[in-house]
Protein backbone atom coordinates (compact mmCIF):
# COMPACT_ATOMS: atom_id res chain seq x y z
CA UNK A 1 0.00 0.00 0.00
CA UNK A 2 1.42 3.36 -1.06
CA UNK A 3 0.83 6.46 1.05
CA UNK A 4 -1.35 9.21 -0.38
CA UNK A 5 0.60 12.45 -0.48
CA UNK A 6 -1.31 14.56 -2.98
CA UNK A 7 -5.06 14.72 -3.70
CA UNK A 8 -7.15 16.56 -6.26
CA UNK A 9 -10.67 17.49 -5.15
CA UNK A 10 -13.14 18.97 -7.65
CA UNK A 11 -16.81 18.41 -6.85
CA UNK A 12 -20.24 19.41 -8.06
CA UNK A 13 -21.86 17.68 -5.08
CA UNK A 14 -19.77 19.00 -2.20
CA UNK A 15 -21.50 17.16 0.66
CA UNK A 16 -18.93 16.21 3.29
CA UNK A 17 -16.07 17.75 1.31
CA UNK A 18 -14.83 20.04 4.07
CA UNK A 19 -14.64 17.31 6.71
CA UNK A 20 -12.92 14.94 4.29
CA UNK A 21 -10.38 17.55 3.22
CA UNK A 22 -9.68 18.38 6.87
CA UNK A 23 -8.93 14.70 7.50
CA UNK A 24 -6.57 14.63 4.52
CA UNK A 25 -4.80 17.74 5.75
CA UNK A 26 -4.26 16.17 9.18
CA UNK A 27 -2.54 13.27 7.42
CA UNK A 28 -0.20 15.67 5.62
CA UNK A 29 -1.85 15.34 2.21
CA UNK A 30 -1.36 18.24 -0.22
CA UNK A 31 -4.70 19.28 -1.73
CA UNK A 32 -5.26 20.59 -5.25
CA UNK A 33 -8.66 21.97 -6.16
CA UNK A 34 -10.66 24.06 -8.62
CA UNK A 35 -13.28 26.80 -8.65
CA UNK A 36 -16.09 26.53 -6.14
CA UNK A 37 -14.57 23.54 -4.36
CA UNK A 38 -11.32 25.42 -3.77
CA UNK A 39 -13.22 28.41 -2.39
CA UNK A 40 -15.27 26.20 -0.08
CA UNK A 41 -12.22 24.43 1.33
CA UNK A 42 -10.15 27.60 1.68
CA UNK A 43 -13.07 29.30 3.41
CA UNK A 44 -13.10 26.47 5.94
CA UNK A 45 -9.40 26.96 6.65
CA UNK A 46 -8.12 23.99 4.63
CA UNK A 47 -4.85 24.78 2.78
CA UNK A 48 -5.55 24.43 -0.94
CA UNK A 49 -3.51 24.90 -4.11
CA UNK A 50 -5.58 26.06 -7.07
CA UNK A 51 -5.07 23.82 -10.09
CA UNK A 52 -4.27 26.88 -12.22
CA UNK A 53 -1.42 27.76 -9.84
CA UNK A 54 -0.21 24.15 -9.81
CA UNK A 55 -0.12 23.82 -13.61
CA UNK A 56 0.90 27.40 -14.34
CA UNK A 57 -1.95 27.54 -16.85
CA UNK A 58 -5.12 29.55 -16.14
CA UNK A 59 -8.68 28.31 -16.32
CA UNK A 60 -10.11 29.41 -19.65
CA UNK A 61 -13.07 29.26 -22.04
CA UNK A 62 -15.61 29.95 -19.28
CA UNK A 63 -14.22 27.11 -17.19
CA UNK A 64 -14.34 24.53 -19.97
CA UNK A 65 -10.60 24.02 -19.64
CA UNK A 66 -9.43 23.66 -16.04
CA UNK A 67 -7.85 20.28 -15.43
CA UNK A 68 -7.13 19.20 -19.03
CA UNK A 69 -3.37 19.59 -18.62
CA UNK A 70 -0.41 17.13 -18.81
CA UNK A 71 0.65 18.02 -15.29
CA UNK A 72 -2.73 16.83 -14.03
CA UNK A 73 -3.26 13.79 -16.24
CA UNK A 74 0.38 12.79 -16.22
CA UNK A 75 0.27 12.89 -12.43
CA UNK A 76 -2.82 10.69 -12.42
CA UNK A 77 -1.93 8.25 -15.22
CA UNK A 78 1.78 7.81 -14.57
CA UNK A 79 2.72 4.33 -13.36
CA UNK A 80 4.96 4.41 -10.34
CA UNK A 81 6.26 0.91 -11.10
CA UNK A 82 7.66 1.75 -14.57
CA UNK A 83 11.05 3.47 -14.63
CA UNK A 84 10.28 5.06 -18.00
CA UNK A 85 7.13 6.70 -16.62
CA UNK A 86 8.94 7.91 -13.51
CA UNK A 87 11.78 9.37 -15.57
CA UNK A 88 9.47 11.20 -17.96
CA UNK A 89 7.47 12.65 -15.11
CA UNK A 90 10.63 13.90 -13.44
CA UNK A 91 11.86 15.33 -16.75
CA UNK A 92 8.68 17.39 -17.17
CA UNK A 93 8.21 18.30 -13.53
CA UNK A 94 5.06 16.22 -13.12
CA UNK A 95 4.31 15.14 -9.57
CA UNK A 96 2.19 12.17 -8.54
CA UNK A 97 -1.50 12.69 -7.79
CA UNK A 98 -2.48 9.80 -5.54
CA UNK A 99 -6.14 10.53 -4.80
CA UNK A 100 -8.78 12.03 -7.08
CA UNK A 101 -12.17 13.09 -5.68
CA UNK A 102 -14.46 14.11 -8.52
CA UNK A 103 -18.17 14.00 -9.24
CA UNK A 104 -19.74 15.36 -12.36
CA UNK A 105 -21.85 18.29 -13.49
CA UNK A 106 -25.52 17.74 -12.55
CA UNK A 107 -26.74 16.77 -16.01
CA UNK A 108 -29.76 14.82 -14.74
CA UNK A 109 -30.95 17.71 -12.57
CA UNK A 110 -30.45 20.13 -15.45
CA UNK A 111 -32.54 18.27 -18.03
CA UNK A 112 -35.25 17.62 -15.41
CA UNK A 113 -35.87 21.36 -15.04
CA UNK A 114 -38.92 22.73 -16.85
CA UNK A 115 -37.86 24.70 -19.90
CA UNK A 116 -34.39 23.18 -20.13
CA UNK A 117 -32.94 24.02 -23.56
CA UNK A 118 -30.40 22.12 -25.61
CA UNK A 119 -27.89 24.84 -24.76
CA UNK A 120 -28.54 24.39 -21.02
CA UNK A 121 -28.01 20.66 -21.35
CA UNK A 122 -24.83 20.97 -23.42
CA UNK A 123 -23.26 23.35 -20.91
CA UNK A 124 -23.85 20.77 -18.18
CA UNK A 125 -22.02 17.98 -19.98
CA UNK A 126 -18.84 17.50 -17.98
CA UNK A 127 -15.62 16.93 -19.94
CA UNK A 128 -12.72 17.41 -17.55
CA UNK A 129 -14.43 15.51 -14.75
CA UNK A 130 -15.02 12.21 -16.60
CA UNK A 131 -11.52 12.44 -18.06
CA UNK A 132 -9.98 12.61 -14.59
CA UNK A 133 -12.29 9.91 -13.28
CA UNK A 134 -11.39 7.50 -16.07
CA UNK A 135 -7.68 8.30 -15.80
CA UNK A 136 -7.64 7.61 -12.08
CA UNK A 137 -9.83 4.52 -12.40
CA UNK A 138 -7.54 3.09 -15.09
CA UNK A 139 -4.49 3.60 -12.88
CA UNK A 140 -6.18 2.16 -9.77
CA UNK A 141 -3.07 0.30 -8.60
CA UNK A 142 -1.45 3.66 -7.89
CA UNK A 143 -4.36 6.13 -7.64
CA UNK A 144 -7.61 6.09 -5.65
CA UNK A 145 -10.70 7.60 -7.27
CA UNK A 146 -13.72 8.71 -5.21
CA UNK A 147 -16.87 9.67 -7.15
CA UNK A 148 -19.45 9.29 -4.37
CA UNK A 149 -19.32 11.67 -1.41
CA UNK A 150 -21.05 8.99 0.69
CA UNK A 151 -17.73 7.10 0.58
CA UNK A 152 -15.80 9.91 2.28
CA UNK A 153 -16.20 8.66 5.88
CA UNK A 154 -15.09 5.11 5.08
CA UNK A 155 -12.11 6.33 3.02
CA UNK A 156 -11.06 8.75 5.76
CA UNK A 157 -11.27 5.99 8.38
CA UNK A 158 -9.14 3.60 6.30
CA UNK A 159 -6.55 6.28 5.61
CA UNK A 160 -6.27 7.05 9.30
CA UNK A 161 -6.01 3.36 10.21
CA UNK A 162 -3.32 2.70 7.58
CA UNK A 163 -1.17 5.79 8.05
CA UNK A 164 -2.45 7.49 4.91
CA UNK A 165 -2.70 4.44 2.63
CA UNK A 166 -5.57 2.55 0.99
CA UNK A 167 -5.62 -1.18 0.27
CA UNK A 168 -5.58 -2.64 -3.23
CA UNK A 169 -9.08 -3.98 -2.59
CA UNK A 170 -10.42 -0.52 -1.75
CA UNK A 171 -8.76 1.12 -4.75
CA UNK A 172 -10.02 -1.57 -7.12
CA UNK A 173 -13.57 -1.30 -5.78
CA UNK A 174 -13.43 2.48 -6.13
CA UNK A 175 -12.21 2.05 -9.71
CA UNK A 176 -15.10 -0.22 -10.61
CA UNK A 177 -17.55 2.21 -9.06
CA UNK A 178 -15.97 5.09 -10.99
CA UNK A 179 -16.25 3.39 -14.37
CA UNK A 180 -19.89 2.59 -13.58
CA UNK A 181 -20.41 6.25 -12.70
CA UNK A 182 -19.05 7.55 -16.01
CA UNK A 183 -20.89 4.85 -17.99
CA UNK A 184 -24.18 5.86 -16.37
CA UNK A 185 -23.41 9.53 -16.99
CA UNK A 186 -22.66 9.00 -20.68
CA UNK A 187 -25.73 6.79 -21.04
CA UNK A 188 -27.89 9.55 -19.59
CA UNK A 189 -26.45 12.06 -22.07
CA UNK A 190 -27.04 9.63 -24.93
CA UNK A 191 -30.65 9.07 -23.84
CA UNK A 192 -31.29 12.80 -23.79
CA UNK A 193 -29.62 13.66 -27.09
CA UNK A 194 -31.13 10.73 -29.01
CA UNK A 195 -34.61 11.62 -27.75
CA UNK A 196 -34.40 15.05 -29.39
CA UNK A 197 -36.09 15.61 -32.72
CA UNK A 198 -34.17 17.29 -35.54
CA UNK A 199 -36.45 20.25 -34.99
CA UNK A 200 -34.43 21.17 -31.92
CA UNK A 201 -31.93 22.89 -34.19
CA UNK A 202 -34.59 25.29 -35.46
CA UNK A 203 -36.11 25.99 -32.07
CA UNK A 204 -39.06 23.60 -32.39
CA UNK A 205 -40.19 21.43 -29.44
CA UNK A 206 -37.09 19.68 -28.28
CA UNK A 207 -37.62 16.36 -26.58
CA UNK A 208 -39.51 13.23 -27.53
CA UNK A 209 -40.72 10.48 -25.24
CA UNK A 210 -38.30 7.70 -26.12
CA UNK A 211 -34.59 7.87 -27.05
CA UNK A 212 -33.40 6.12 -30.20
CA UNK A 213 -30.72 4.47 -28.06
CA UNK A 214 -31.91 3.43 -24.62
CA UNK A 215 -29.38 3.21 -21.79
CA UNK A 216 -30.25 2.19 -18.25
CA UNK A 217 -28.09 1.70 -15.16
CA UNK A 218 -28.96 -0.66 -12.32
CA UNK A 219 -27.26 -1.46 -9.03
CA UNK A 220 -27.29 -5.03 -7.76
CA UNK A 221 -29.03 -5.29 -4.41
CA UNK A 222 -28.60 -9.02 -3.92
CA UNK A 223 -28.07 -12.39 -5.53
CA UNK A 224 -31.11 -14.57 -4.96
CA UNK A 225 -31.28 -18.23 -4.00
CA UNK A 226 -33.07 -18.87 -7.28
CA UNK A 227 -35.46 -17.24 -9.72
CA UNK A 228 -39.12 -17.79 -10.44
CA UNK A 229 -38.39 -21.53 -10.19
CA UNK A 230 -35.57 -23.36 -8.37
CA UNK A 231 -33.71 -24.24 -11.59
CA UNK A 232 -33.42 -20.55 -12.56
CA UNK A 233 -30.64 -18.25 -11.31
CA UNK A 234 -31.57 -14.69 -10.36
CA UNK A 235 -30.51 -11.37 -8.84
CA UNK A 236 -32.34 -8.21 -7.80
CA UNK A 237 -31.21 -4.85 -9.18
CA UNK A 238 -32.30 -1.37 -8.14
CA UNK A 239 -32.72 1.54 -10.53
CA UNK A 240 -29.85 3.97 -10.03
CA UNK A 241 -32.42 6.77 -9.72
CA UNK A 242 -35.63 5.11 -8.50
CA UNK A 243 -38.96 6.90 -8.40
CA UNK A 244 -40.08 8.14 -4.99
CA UNK A 245 -42.04 5.53 -3.08
CA UNK A 246 -40.70 2.60 -5.11
CA UNK A 247 -40.50 -0.87 -3.61
CA UNK A 248 -36.72 -0.86 -4.07
CA UNK A 249 -36.48 1.61 -1.16
CA UNK A 250 -37.69 -1.08 1.26
CA UNK A 251 -36.11 -1.65 4.65
CA UNK A 252 -36.44 -5.27 5.78
CA UNK A 253 -37.03 -5.37 9.53
CA UNK A 254 -37.19 -9.13 9.99
CA UNK A 255 -37.66 -12.46 8.26
CA UNK A 256 -36.01 -14.67 5.70
CA UNK A 257 -34.27 -13.33 2.63
CA UNK A 258 -36.71 -12.07 0.02
CA UNK A 259 -37.18 -14.43 -2.92
CA UNK A 260 -37.64 -13.53 -6.58
CA UNK A 261 -41.38 -14.20 -6.34
CA UNK A 262 -41.64 -12.31 -3.03
CA UNK A 263 -40.25 -9.17 -4.67
CA UNK A 264 -42.44 -9.50 -7.76
CA UNK A 265 -45.58 -9.97 -5.66
CA UNK A 266 -44.60 -7.28 -3.16
CA UNK A 267 -44.19 -4.80 -5.98
CA UNK A 268 -47.69 -5.59 -7.27
CA UNK A 269 -49.12 -5.18 -3.76
CA UNK A 270 -47.26 -1.95 -3.07
CA UNK A 271 -48.21 -0.27 -6.34
CA UNK A 272 -51.85 -1.15 -5.71
CA UNK A 273 -52.07 -0.12 -2.07
CA UNK A 274 -50.35 3.22 -2.51
CA UNK A 275 -52.90 4.19 -5.19
CA UNK A 276 -55.59 4.61 -2.51
CA UNK A 277 -56.02 7.80 -0.49
CA UNK A 278 -58.00 6.20 2.35
CA UNK A 279 -56.45 3.59 4.68
CA UNK A 280 -56.20 0.46 2.54
CA UNK A 281 -55.12 -3.17 2.63
CA UNK A 282 -54.17 -5.19 -0.44
CA UNK A 283 -53.53 -8.94 -0.33
CA UNK A 284 -51.68 -10.31 -3.37
CA UNK A 285 -51.02 -13.83 -4.62
CA UNK A 286 -49.05 -14.51 -7.81
CA UNK A 287 -49.00 -10.78 -8.66
CA UNK A 288 -52.83 -10.55 -8.53
CA UNK A 289 -54.89 -8.93 -5.79
CA UNK A 290 -57.10 -11.53 -4.13
CA UNK A 291 -58.56 -9.07 -1.61
CA UNK A 292 -58.63 -5.28 -1.38
CA UNK A 293 -60.42 -2.94 1.01
CA UNK A 294 -60.44 0.65 2.22
CA UNK A 295 -61.70 1.52 5.69
CA UNK A 296 -61.27 3.87 8.62
CA UNK A 297 -58.29 1.93 10.01
CA UNK A 298 -55.85 -0.84 9.08
CA UNK A 299 -57.54 -3.52 11.18
CA UNK A 300 -60.90 -3.07 9.49
CA UNK A 301 -59.29 -2.79 6.06
CA UNK A 302 -57.46 -6.09 6.62
CA UNK A 303 -60.56 -7.91 7.85
CA UNK A 304 -62.52 -6.81 4.79
CA UNK A 305 -59.73 -7.60 2.32
CA UNK A 306 -59.15 -11.03 3.89
CA UNK A 307 -62.86 -11.84 3.76
CA UNK A 308 -62.84 -11.56 -0.04
CA UNK A 309 -60.90 -14.80 -0.49
CA UNK A 310 -59.59 -16.46 2.65
CA UNK A 311 -58.23 -19.43 0.70
CA UNK A 312 -56.12 -17.47 -1.80
CA UNK A 313 -54.84 -15.15 0.94
CA UNK A 314 -52.87 -18.05 2.46
CA UNK A 315 -49.17 -17.48 1.81
CA UNK A 316 -49.85 -14.08 0.28
CA UNK A 317 -48.31 -10.63 0.43
CA UNK A 318 -50.15 -8.15 2.66
CA UNK A 319 -49.63 -4.43 2.11
CA UNK A 320 -50.96 -1.35 3.91
CA UNK A 321 -50.68 2.35 3.11
CA UNK A 322 -50.80 3.44 6.77
CA UNK A 323 -48.84 2.70 9.93
CA UNK A 324 -49.76 -0.77 11.19
CA UNK A 325 -50.47 -1.37 14.88
CA UNK A 326 -50.19 -4.44 17.07
CA UNK A 327 -53.90 -5.26 16.96
CA UNK A 328 -53.77 -5.51 13.18
CA UNK A 329 -50.69 -7.73 13.15
CA UNK A 330 -52.20 -10.01 15.80
CA UNK A 331 -55.36 -10.38 13.72
CA UNK A 332 -53.27 -11.29 10.67
CA UNK A 333 -51.06 -13.81 12.45
CA UNK A 334 -54.10 -15.41 14.10
CA UNK A 335 -55.84 -15.68 10.73
CA UNK A 336 -53.27 -16.83 8.22
CA UNK A 337 -49.79 -17.66 7.02
CA UNK A 338 -48.17 -14.88 5.01
CA UNK A 339 -44.90 -14.46 3.14
CA UNK A 340 -44.49 -10.67 3.36
CA UNK A 341 -46.05 -7.92 5.48
CA UNK A 342 -45.39 -4.38 4.30
CA UNK A 343 -46.37 -0.85 5.28
CA UNK A 344 -44.89 2.64 5.54
CA UNK A 345 -44.37 2.09 9.28
CA UNK A 346 -45.07 -0.35 12.12
CA UNK A 347 -45.60 0.40 15.80
CA UNK A 348 -43.23 -1.17 18.32
CA UNK A 349 -46.03 -3.47 19.48
CA UNK A 350 -46.70 -4.57 15.90
CA UNK A 351 -43.05 -5.53 15.41
CA UNK A 352 -42.99 -7.36 18.73
CA UNK A 353 -45.99 -9.47 17.70
CA UNK A 354 -44.59 -10.07 14.20
CA UNK A 355 -41.29 -11.26 15.71
CA UNK A 356 -43.06 -14.40 16.93
CA UNK A 357 -43.33 -15.37 13.25
CA UNK A 358 -39.60 -15.10 12.60
CA UNK A 359 -39.76 -16.25 8.97
CA UNK A 360 -42.27 -13.59 7.93
CA UNK A 361 -40.56 -10.86 5.95
CA UNK A 362 -41.56 -7.46 7.37
CA UNK A 363 -40.83 -4.49 5.11
CA UNK A 364 -41.11 -0.77 5.67
CA UNK A 365 -41.42 1.17 2.42
CA UNK A 366 -41.60 4.97 2.22
CA UNK A 367 -45.07 6.04 1.13
CA UNK A 368 -44.38 8.73 -1.43
CA UNK A 369 -46.10 9.72 -4.64
CA UNK A 370 -44.19 8.84 -7.77
CA UNK A 371 -43.90 6.36 -10.59
CA UNK A 372 -41.11 5.08 -12.76
CA UNK A 373 -40.66 7.08 -15.94
CA UNK A 374 -40.78 3.86 -17.96
CA UNK A 375 -42.01 0.31 -17.54
CA UNK A 376 -39.82 -2.32 -19.17
CA UNK A 377 -40.63 -5.80 -20.45
CA UNK A 378 -38.13 -8.12 -22.10
CA UNK A 379 -39.12 -10.00 -25.23
CA UNK A 380 -36.91 -12.25 -27.34
CA UNK A 381 -33.99 -10.08 -28.45
CA UNK A 382 -35.74 -6.86 -27.52
CA UNK A 383 -37.31 -4.62 -24.92
CA UNK A 384 -40.81 -3.18 -24.74
CA UNK A 385 -40.84 0.25 -23.11
CA UNK A 386 -43.93 2.19 -22.05
CA UNK A 387 -44.98 4.93 -19.68
CA UNK A 388 -46.63 3.62 -16.49
CA UNK A 389 -50.39 3.24 -16.21
CA UNK A 390 -50.96 5.89 -13.56
CA UNK A 391 -54.19 7.34 -14.91
CA UNK A 392 -56.68 8.19 -12.18
CA UNK A 393 -60.29 9.17 -12.76
CA UNK A 394 -62.98 10.86 -10.74
CA UNK A 395 -66.72 11.09 -11.07
CA UNK A 396 -66.53 14.02 -13.49
CA UNK A 397 -64.54 11.88 -15.95
CA UNK A 398 -67.28 9.27 -16.29
CA UNK A 399 -70.14 9.17 -18.77
CA UNK A 400 -73.36 7.41 -17.84
CA UNK A 401 -74.71 5.45 -20.83
CA UNK A 402 -77.66 3.79 -19.09
CA UNK A 403 -81.14 5.06 -18.33
CA UNK A 404 -80.60 4.65 -14.61
CA UNK A 405 -78.10 6.93 -12.88
CA UNK A 406 -75.81 5.46 -10.21
CA UNK A 407 -76.70 6.23 -6.61
CA UNK A 408 -74.26 8.14 -4.43
CA UNK A 409 -73.02 4.90 -2.86
CA UNK A 410 -72.70 3.28 -6.28
CA UNK A 411 -70.55 6.17 -7.53
CA UNK A 412 -68.13 5.57 -4.67
CA UNK A 413 -68.10 1.82 -5.24
CA UNK A 414 -67.62 2.19 -8.99
CA UNK A 415 -64.52 4.31 -8.49
CA UNK A 416 -63.21 1.81 -5.93
CA UNK A 417 -63.62 -1.31 -8.09
CA UNK A 418 -62.26 0.53 -11.12
CA UNK A 419 -59.08 1.38 -9.25
CA UNK A 420 -58.69 -2.24 -8.13
CA UNK A 421 -59.22 -3.55 -11.67
CA UNK A 422 -56.18 -1.61 -12.85
CA UNK A 423 -53.94 -3.91 -10.79
CA UNK A 424 -55.57 -7.21 -11.78
CA UNK A 425 -54.21 -9.28 -14.69
CA UNK A 426 -56.39 -9.12 -17.79
CA UNK A 427 -59.05 -10.11 -18.46
CA UNK A 428 -60.01 -8.52 -15.15
CA UNK A 429 -63.43 -8.36 -13.49
CA UNK A 430 -63.84 -6.93 -9.98
CA UNK A 431 -66.98 -6.96 -7.85
CA UNK A 432 -67.21 -4.81 -4.74
CA UNK A 433 -69.37 -2.91 -2.31
CA UNK A 434 -68.71 -0.50 0.55
CA UNK A 435 -64.99 -0.22 -0.12
CA UNK A 436 -64.48 -4.00 -0.13
CA UNK A 437 -63.83 -6.38 -3.01
CA UNK A 438 -66.44 -9.14 -3.15
CA UNK A 439 -64.99 -11.17 -6.00
CA UNK A 440 -62.02 -10.90 -8.37
CA UNK A 441 -61.77 -12.72 -11.69
CA UNK A 442 -58.26 -12.49 -13.12
CA UNK A 443 -56.14 -13.56 -16.05
CA UNK A 444 -58.71 -15.40 -18.15
CA UNK A 445 -58.63 -15.52 -21.94
CA UNK A 446 -62.40 -14.91 -21.99
CA UNK A 447 -63.95 -11.92 -20.22
CA UNK A 448 -67.13 -13.78 -19.43
CA UNK A 449 -65.06 -16.52 -17.76
CA UNK A 450 -63.43 -13.89 -15.53
CA UNK A 451 -66.93 -12.67 -14.71
CA UNK A 452 -68.04 -16.16 -13.70
CA UNK A 453 -64.93 -16.64 -11.57
CA UNK A 454 -65.55 -13.35 -9.74
CA UNK A 455 -69.12 -14.48 -9.05
CA UNK A 456 -67.97 -17.87 -7.78
CA UNK A 457 -65.38 -16.22 -5.51
CA UNK A 458 -68.09 -14.08 -3.93
CA UNK A 459 -70.32 -17.11 -3.46
CA UNK A 460 -67.49 -19.12 -1.88
CA UNK A 461 -66.79 -16.23 0.50
CA UNK A 462 -70.46 -15.94 1.46
CA UNK A 463 -70.63 -12.35 0.21
CA UNK A 464 -74.00 -11.14 -1.05
CA UNK A 465 -73.58 -9.42 -4.41
CA UNK A 466 -77.00 -7.80 -4.35
CA UNK A 467 -76.42 -4.07 -4.75
CA UNK A 468 -72.71 -4.48 -5.47
CA UNK A 469 -70.80 -2.85 -8.34
CA UNK A 470 -68.63 -4.37 -11.07
CA UNK A 471 -65.58 -3.17 -13.00
CA UNK A 472 -64.13 -4.54 -16.22
CA UNK A 473 -60.61 -3.47 -17.22
CA UNK A 474 -61.62 -3.41 -20.91
CA UNK A 475 -64.85 -3.28 -22.89
CA UNK A 476 -67.36 -6.11 -22.99
CA UNK A 477 -67.10 -7.65 -26.48
CA UNK A 478 -70.57 -9.17 -26.07
CA UNK A 479 -73.52 -8.65 -23.74
CA UNK A 480 -72.96 -12.06 -22.08
CA UNK A 481 -70.71 -10.57 -19.38
CA UNK A 482 -73.40 -8.05 -18.45
CA UNK A 483 -76.00 -10.81 -18.31
CA UNK A 484 -73.85 -12.87 -15.92
CA UNK A 485 -73.28 -9.79 -13.76
CA UNK A 486 -77.01 -9.07 -13.66
CA UNK A 487 -77.72 -12.63 -12.48
CA UNK A 488 -75.69 -11.84 -9.34
CA UNK A 489 -77.88 -8.89 -8.36
CA UNK A 490 -75.19 -6.32 -9.19
CA UNK A 491 -76.69 -2.91 -9.90
CA UNK A 492 -73.87 -0.82 -11.42
CA UNK A 493 -71.02 -1.44 -13.88
CA UNK A 494 -67.98 0.58 -14.91
CA UNK A 495 -65.91 -0.20 -18.00
CA UNK A 496 -64.10 1.63 -20.82
CA UNK A 497 -66.53 0.91 -23.70
CA UNK A 498 -65.16 0.93 -27.24
CA UNK A 499 -66.56 -2.35 -28.56
CA UNK A 500 -68.28 -2.70 -31.93
CA UNK A 501 -71.20 -4.02 -29.90
CA UNK A 502 -71.26 -1.24 -27.31
CA UNK A 503 -74.92 -0.48 -27.96
CA UNK A 504 -75.88 -4.11 -27.31
CA UNK A 505 -73.99 -3.92 -24.02
CA UNK A 506 -75.65 -0.61 -23.08
CA UNK A 507 -79.07 -2.04 -23.97
CA UNK A 508 -78.39 -5.10 -21.80
CA UNK A 509 -77.67 -2.81 -18.85
CA UNK A 510 -80.99 -1.05 -19.38
CA UNK A 511 -82.85 -4.35 -19.67
CA UNK A 512 -81.49 -5.37 -16.27
CA UNK A 513 -81.96 -1.96 -14.64
CA UNK A 514 -78.20 -1.60 -14.22
CA UNK A 515 -76.51 1.79 -14.04
CA UNK A 516 -73.54 1.82 -16.42
CA UNK A 517 -70.69 4.34 -16.50
CA UNK A 518 -67.90 4.34 -19.09
CA UNK A 519 -64.39 5.67 -18.65
CA UNK A 520 -63.00 5.81 -22.18
CA UNK A 521 -59.76 4.44 -20.70
CA UNK A 522 -58.60 0.83 -20.74
CA UNK A 523 -56.44 -0.86 -18.10
CA UNK A 524 -55.01 -3.99 -19.72
CA UNK A 525 -52.35 -5.65 -17.56
CA UNK A 526 -50.25 -8.51 -18.88
UniProtKB/Swiss-Prot annotation:
SMART domains attached to this UniProt entry: AICARFT_IMPCHas (SM00798), MGS (SM00851)
Membrane-spanning segments: none
Record keywords, A-Z: Hydrolase, Multifunctional enzyme, Purine biosynthesis, Transferase
Gene3D superfamilies attached to this UniProt entry: 3.40.140.20, Methylglyoxal synthase-like domain
Catalyzed reactions: (6R)-10-formyltetrahydrofolate + 5-amino-1-(5-phospho-beta-D-ribosyl)imidazole-4-carboxamide = 5-formamido-1-(5-phospho-D-ribosyl)imidazole-4-carboxamide + (6S)-5,6,7,8-tetrahydrofolate; IMP + H2O = 5-formamido-1-(5-phospho-D-ribosyl)imidazole-4-carboxamide
GO molecular function (one): IMP cyclohydrolase activity
Protein's UniProt keywords contain Transferase: yes
Domain MGS-like: 1-147
One Pfam family recorded for the sequence: MGS
Biochemical pathway: Purine metabolism; IMP biosynthesis via de novo pathway; 5-formamido-1-(5-phospho-D-ribosyl)imidazole-4-carboxamide from 5-amino-1-(5-phospho-D-ribosyl)imidazole-4-carboxamide (10-formyl THF route): step 1/1; Purine metabolism; IMP biosynthesis via de novo pathway; IMP from 5-formamido-1-(5-phospho-D-ribosyl)imidazole-4-carboxamide: step 1/1
GO terms classed as biological process: 'de novo' IMP biosynthetic process
EC number(s) recorded for this UniProt protein: 2.1.2.3, 3.5.4.10
InterPro entries listed in its UniProt record: AICAR_Tfase_dup_dom_sf, Cytidine_deaminase-like, MGS-like_dom, MGS-like_dom_sf, PurH-like
One GO CC term on file: cytosol
Description of its domains: The IMP cyclohydrolase activity resides in the N-terminal region.
Family membership: Belongs to the PurH family.
Protein name per Swiss-Prot or TrEMBL: Bifunctional purine biosynthesis protein PurH
Species: Neisseria gonorrhoeae (strain ATCC 700825 / FA 1090)
Gene designation per UniProt: purH
Amino acid sequence: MSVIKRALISLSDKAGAVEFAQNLHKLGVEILSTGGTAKLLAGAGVPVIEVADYTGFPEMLDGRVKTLHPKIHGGILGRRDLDEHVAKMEEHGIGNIDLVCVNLYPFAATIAKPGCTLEDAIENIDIGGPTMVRSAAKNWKHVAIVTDTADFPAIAAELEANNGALSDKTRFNLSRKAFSHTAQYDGMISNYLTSLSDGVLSGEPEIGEFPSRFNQSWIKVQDMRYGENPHQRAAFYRDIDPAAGSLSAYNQLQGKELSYNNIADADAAWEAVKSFDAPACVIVKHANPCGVAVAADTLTAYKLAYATDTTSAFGGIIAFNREVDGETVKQITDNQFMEVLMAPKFTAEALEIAAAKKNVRVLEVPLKAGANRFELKRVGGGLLVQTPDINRINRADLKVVSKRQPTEQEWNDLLFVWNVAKYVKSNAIVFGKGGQTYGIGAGQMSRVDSTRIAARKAQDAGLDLNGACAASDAFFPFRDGVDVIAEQGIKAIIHPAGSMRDQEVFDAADEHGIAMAVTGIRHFRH
